[in-house]
Regions:
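Structural motif
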Residues: 43, 361-364, 623-628, 650-655, ...
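Conserved SF1/SF2 helicase motif Ia
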Residues: 637-652
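Conserved motor-coupling elements within RecA-like helicase/translocase cores
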Residues: 659-694
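Acidic, two-metal ion nucleic-acid-processing modules in DNA metabolism proteins
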Residues: 110, 248-291, 295-343, 400-407, ...
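Short, ordered loop/turn segments at secondary-structure junctions
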Residues: 93-94, 121-124, 151-152, 174-177, ...
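Hydrophobic helix-and-loop "lid/oligomerization" segment in the mid-to-C-terminal part
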Residues: 5-11, 16, 20-145, 164-166, ...
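Terminal, basic amphipathic appendages of nucleotide-handling enzymes
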Residues: 1-32, 42, 46-57, 61, ...
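Conserved phosphate-handling catalytic cores of large alpha/beta enzymes
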Residues: 138-141, 148, 152-241, 696
C-alpha cells in the first residue's frame, strides 16, 4: 500500500518551535517528563487541566445520564414495567458491543427486581436489529415490552409493527439515526440530531450503562452499576469508538476491575487464553479477548457468548468457554480458506487485480468472516474489495475500503445501474444483497462508479508518527503507560527508528502474510520485530533464505511477558517500513512467481543446484498440487507457457505427482512436459522442456 509518513515532532515542521514551548510549559505545569508532555501535545492536549484530566480521569468525566434525550421517558417506562411486574425482553446485537450490552442490562435490571429475558438474533438467519418474526414470537410468549440495545434506531417498520400489536418499545442505540425516527416510546441515542448530550462517542454498551445508572438513581437498592464496568470496557474497546471523555474513564475503570475481580465468565475466558489478569490492557482485550466473544455471533449463535457473560455456574461457564474457543478456531479456518481461495481467483484472473475495485464471489462463503477477509484484501491491494457469498438465486456481500474511498458514495453512484437489491453501512465498511446472476454487472457498475467519482485517484495510507527515536530509557514505558487505555482517537505512541539492521526473518500466517525478525538499532537496541499483514511489501525478498538488510521502521513498543514467568522482553510492532540498502537483484529467487506463497518449498527446491543454475535467468511459475484446484492450475500453466515461462510443479509424493501429471498431460502437449518417476533432471532436459514435475 502507498503510504505517507507524518512526523509530529519534526524539527523541520514550521510549528515545531511553538509545539516545543507548549510541551515545556505543560511539563512544568503538570509535573511530567518532557517526553510525556511531547506525547500529550502530539495528541492535541496543551492545557494543563485537560492534561491532568486525561492522565487521571475521574467521575468529573461522567455526565448526568438525564442530559440524554428521552432518558427520563425510558426510565419512567421501565419503572412502570417493574411496578406492574411485567416481562421485559432485551433485544441485542450479535457483535461484542451488542452481547456485552445485553449482558449488562440483563444482570443489572434483574438485580434491581425486573423480570427480564434476552434475545440476540442470528446473523445468518435474521440479520441485524429487530424483525417481525421475533416480535411476533415475543407477543406469543407474553412479552409486551421490548428494550433494544446497540440497535433499533433504524427499525422504523418493525417498531411500527410492534406498536400496532400494543407493545412498549424502548430503543437504546448509538448508530447514526435516519431522518425518520421510529415511533418507539423512547429513543435513547446521543447521536440524535435533537440530543444535546455533551459526548456523542459512546458505544452501545456505554448508552446501556447510562440507562442502568439512571434507573438505579430512581430505585432504593444496594446494586452498584460499576460492579459490571468490566463489561462496559470490553464492549467499548471492541466497537472501536473514541477512547476519550466518558469512554476513557469507563475503559480505565473496567480494566482495573478485570485485573482484580472480573465477572466469572470473563475470568474463565482469560484463564483459558493463558493471559495473566494483571497484564490486561486495551490491546489484549481488542486482539485476544474480544475476537473470542465475537466468534459466537460470526459462526453460530451469539447467545453462547451471552450465556458465558451472565453465568455463575462453573460447569456452564467451562462449557461455554470451550464452545467459544472451538468457534474461534472454526472462524480462523473459514477465514483462511476464503482468503486463500480469493488470492487464487485473483492470481488466475490478473485483470481483477488491475481493476479499481476488486469484486470476488464464491459458492456459499461463510457470511460471518466475509468482512474480515475483505479487510485483509483491501489492505493488501490498497483498493475497495467486495466479496459475495452466492447461492443459486441470491448473493450477500461485504465490502471494505481503504481511507479516502467512501463506500456509501460509491454504492449510491453504482445503484443507478440497478445492481443492488439493498445496501447499507459506513464509509469504509458496508453490506449489500444482489441477485446471483448480477455479479458481473456489479463488478462493471462499481468500477464505472469509481471512475466517475475518483478518476485515477489511488488511495494512500497516512502513518502518524509521534517522533523519531534511537533508544529507550528507564521511565520510557512508565510515561507511555500513563496514556492508556489505547484505541481509536488515542492510539499507541508511534516511533520512527532509522536505519536499523534486521535479520533472522520468519514468515507466517495465511499465505505467509506476516513476518517476524530480529532488529538492532544504531544505538544497539535489540528486540523482536513483528509485521502483521506487511509481508507483501517484502515482494521477492520473501523467497530469500538469508535476508539481511537495513530498514527505516515505524511502529509501537510493547513489553511482553512469558506465560507463567517473570521474564519480560521487548517487542516492536511494525506499522510500516522502508527497506534501505538492499539490491533486489541479489535475491535468491527473484524470478519465481507462485500461485500462493510456497516459501519453504522454494527454498528446498533451491538446494537442487541443477534447477537453480539453469532456471535462474528465466521467469518461473511454481505450483503445489494439494493447495490449488486443478482447473486453476491448468489455467495458470497455460498462461505461463503463453508468456514463455518455465513451469515447475511440486508434489509432496510420487503418487500425488503421478496423478497431477495424468491430468495436466491431458490438456498440455506432452512433448513440452518432463516427468520422471525418479525425478532425475539434467541441464539438457531443463533447456528443452517447459513443464517440470518435481518431488521434494
Amino acid at each position: 500500500m502507498s503510504s505517507i509518513w507524518r512526523i509530529f515532532w519534526d524539527p523541520n515542521d514550521p510549528d515545531y518551535t511553538d509545539n516545543l514551548k507548549n510541551a515545556r510549559k505543560l511539563c512544568a505545569d503538570v509535573g511530567v517528563s518532557e517526553f510525556l508532555s511531547k506525547l500529550l501535545v502530539a495528541r492535541g492536549i496543551v492545557d494543563a487541566q485537560e492534561a491532568k484530566t486525561f492522565l487521571e480521569p475521574g467521575m468529573e468525566n461522567v455526565f448526568d445520564p438525564f442530559l440524554m434525550k428521552d432518558m427520563e421517558k425510558a426510565v419512567q417506562k421501565l419503572l412502570e414495567i417493574r411496578q406492574k411486574k411485567e416481562k421485559l425482553v432485551i433485544f441485542g446485537d450479535y457483535d461484542v458491543d451488542g452481547v456485552t450490552s445485553a449482558s449488562l442490562l440483563y444482570l443489572g435490571l434483574n438485580e434491581m427486581g425486573f423480570d427480564t429475558q434476552a434475545y440476540i438474533p442470528s446473523r445468518m438467519d435474521e440479520g441485524y436489529s429487530l424483525n417481525t418474526d421475533a416480535i411476533e414470537d415475543f407477543r406469543n410468549k407474553k412479552y409486551q415490552n421490548i428494550l433494544t440495545v446497540d440497535c433499533g434506531v433504524t427499525s422504523v417498520q418493525e417498531i411500527k409493527y410492534a406498536k400496532e400489536l400494543g407493545m412498549t418499545v424502548i430503543v437504546t442505540d448509538h448508530h447514526e439515526p435516519p431522518k425518520e425516527l421510529p415511533c418507539a416510546d423512547a429513543i435513547v441515542n446521543p447521536k440524535r440530531l435533537d440530543d444535546e448530550y455533551p459526548f456523542k462517542g459512546l458505544a452501545g454498551v456505554g448508552v446501556a450503562f447510562k440507562l442502568l445508572t439512571a434507573v438505579k438513581s430512581k430505585i432504593e437498592t444496594n446494586f452498584d452499576p460499576f460492579s459490571l464496568i468490566d463489561l462496559v470496557a470490553v464492549g467499548t474497546i471492541a466497537d472501536i469508538v473514541p477512547l476519550l471523555s466518558e469512554n476513557r474513564y469507563f475503559v480505565r475503570k473496567g480494566i482495573e476491575k478485570i485485573k482484580k475481580s472480573p465477572i466469572a465468565g470473563l475470568e474463565a475466558l482469560i484463564k483459558e487464553l493463558r493471559i495473566q489478569k494483571e497484564e490486561i490492557t486495551s490491546q489484549i482485550i481488542a486482539y485476544k479477548i474480544a475476537p473470542k466473544i465475537n466468534a459466537a455471533g460470526r459462526m453460530a449463535d451469539a447467545f453462547t457468548a451471552f450465556k458465558l457473560l451472565i453465568s455463575q455456574n462453573h460447569e456452564e461457564i467451562s462449557k461455554n468457554v470451550s464452545s467459544l474457543i472451538k468457534l474461534n478456531t472454526k472462524r480462523q479456518a473459514k477465514e483462511k480458506e476464503i482468503y486463500l481461495y480469493a488470492l487464487s481467483l485473483i492470481d488466475v484472473n490478473p485483470e481483477l487485480k488491475e481493476s479499481k475495485v476488486i469484486v470476488l464471489s464464491g459458492e456459499n462463503w461463510h457470511l460471518g468472516v466475509l468482512g474480515i477477509v475483505a479487510s485483509k484484501l483491501s489492505a493488501l491491494y490498497n483498493k475497495p474489495v467486495l466479496l459475495v457469498s452466492k447461492d443459486e438465486h441470491s448473493g450477500k456481500g461485504s465490502a471494505r475500503s481503504p481511507a479516502g474511498i467512501n463506500l456509501m458514495e460509491l454504492f449510491k453512484e453504482a445503484s443507478k445501474y440497478n445492481v443492488f437489491k439493498e445496501f447499507g453501512g459506513h464509509e469504509l465498511a458496508a453490506g449489500f444483497t444482489i441477485d446471483s446472476q448480477d455479479i458481473d454487472s456489479l463488478r462493471i457498475s462499481v468500477n464505472k462508479a469509481y471512475e466517475e467519482l475518483y478518476k485515477e485517484h489511488v488511495p494512500y495510507y497516512e502513518v502518524f508518527i509521534d517522533m523519531e527515536i534511537e533508544n529507550v530509557w528507564s521511565s520510557f514505558f512508565e510515561d507511555i503507560e500513563r496514556l492508556e487505555p489505547f484505541g481509536y482517537r488515542n492510539p499507541e505512541p508511534t516511533f520512527l527508528i532509522m536505519n536499523s539492521h534486521v535479520d533472522n526473518f520468519k514468515f507466517f500466517g495465511n499465505g505467509v502474510e506476516n513476518f517476524a525478525a530480529k532488529m538492532r538499532s544504531q544505538k544497539d537496541l535489540i528486540m523482536d520485530v513483528i509485521g502483521y499483514g506487511l509481508s507483501q511489501k517484502m515482494l521477492d525478498l520473501r523467497y530469500n533464505s538469508q535476508l539481511n538488510l537495513n530498514m527505516d521502521m515505524v511502529g509501537n513498543f510493547r513489553v511482553e511477558k512469558v506465560h507463567n514467568s517473570k521474564i519480560s522482553y521487548l517487542k516492536y510492532y511494525l506499522k510500516d517500513f522502508e527497506i534501505k540498502n538492499f539490491d533486489v537483484n541479489s535475491c535468491e529467487y527473484k524470478n519465481v512467481e507462485t500461485n500462493i506463497i510456497l516459501r519453504d518449498e522454494i527454498i528446498r527446491i533451491g538446494k537442487l543446484n541443477v534447477i537453480t543454475d539453469n532456471l535462474s535467468s528465466e521467469k518461473v511459475s511454481m505450483f503445489l498440487p494439494p493447495r490449488i484446484k486443478y482447473a486453476t492450475m491448468l489455467k495458470k500453466i497455460s498462461d505461463s507457457l503463453s508468456a514463455s515461462r518455465k513451469v515447475v510443479i511440486i508434489g509432496s509424493s510420487h503418487i500425488v505427482l503421478s496423478h497431477t501429471y495424468s491430468i495436466v498431460s491431458s490438456y498440455i502437449t506432452p512433448s513440452n512436459i518432463y516427468y520422471n518417476k525418479k525425478s532425475r533432471i539434467n541441464s539438457k532436459v531443463l533447456s528443452h522442456e517447459s513443464v517440470f514435475f518435481v518431488t521434494l
